[in-house]
């Protein structure tokens, strides 16, 4: 199980120890701290911490460093409502996606997922799906990136309005998460929304409730905003369904 608040405490303690061990340990500690801050919803704080990382040769080649900038700006984009700031954040997302593609080995999940993500942003759904499917066919059950690849395939199919294929890969990603004992359930949450839109209220409510329990357990406040929009609507629909069945 994973608790974000615990991760923040550990990151802060590791950073204190890193001061005695040298620059690269400090840089790694700052990255861990930024990751934890982003996950508790303190995105601007996370960016400030990342800006403190010294751009050593090792850091400039570290995909984790650029991944953190990418995901933090993505969090900023998702939380923002003002159009001009959303455009600013999207420019940063695209820039860091390009950087990740440039420094990643072409045979890695980092390269392939960011390449396909960029194609998706350009509306090139079929090309992105073709490339990612090719990579996915070689993913074993022990591949730690398997669920992430399945989730991205679902997003790409959603982009081209193929709801059935999107549901297929969301189900697969959910199963992979459960098999790997990962209390993430982002795929389950998205699946709940699709099922609700199709009128399958009971399953939608069960799945989004499971996602909410995960967020509450892990104290992952960065994900509450993802659930908050649909949870009241799905709950109200489920309450109406139960009353109608009585």
Q: For each predicted feature, which ranges?
A:
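A "functional boundary" signal
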Residues: 1-243
């Amino acid at each position: 199980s994973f608790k974000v608040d615990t991760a923040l405490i550990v990151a802060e303690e590791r950073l204190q120890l890193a001061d005695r061990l040298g620059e690269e340990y400090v840089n790694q500690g700052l990255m861990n701290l930024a990751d934890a801050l982003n996950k508790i919803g303190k995105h601007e704080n996370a960016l400030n911490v990342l800006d403190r990382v010294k751009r050593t040769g090792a850091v400039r080649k570290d995909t984790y460093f650029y991944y953190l900038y990418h995901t933090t700006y993505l969090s900023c984009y998702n939380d923002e409502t003002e159009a001009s700031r959303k455009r600013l954040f999207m420019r940063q997302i695209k820039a860091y996606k390009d950087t990740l593609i440039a420094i990643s080995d072409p045979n890695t999940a980092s390269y392939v997922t960011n390449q396909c993500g960029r194609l998706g942003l350009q509306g090139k759904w079929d090309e992105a799906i073709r490339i990612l499917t090719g990579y996915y066919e070689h993913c074993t059950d022990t591949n730690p990136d398997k669920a992430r690849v399945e989730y991205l395939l679902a997003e790409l199919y959603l982009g081209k309005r193929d709801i059935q294929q999107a549901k297929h890969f969301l189900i697969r990603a959910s199963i992979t998460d459960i098999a790997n004992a990962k209390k993430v359930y982002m795929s389950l949450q998205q699946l709940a929304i699709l099922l609700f839109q199709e009128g399958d209220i009971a399953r939608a409510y069960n799945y989004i409730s499971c996602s909410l329990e995960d967020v509450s357990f892990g104290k992952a406040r960065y994900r509450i905003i993802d659930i908050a929009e649909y949870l009241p609507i799905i709950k109200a629909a489920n309450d109406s369904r139960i009353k109608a069945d009585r």
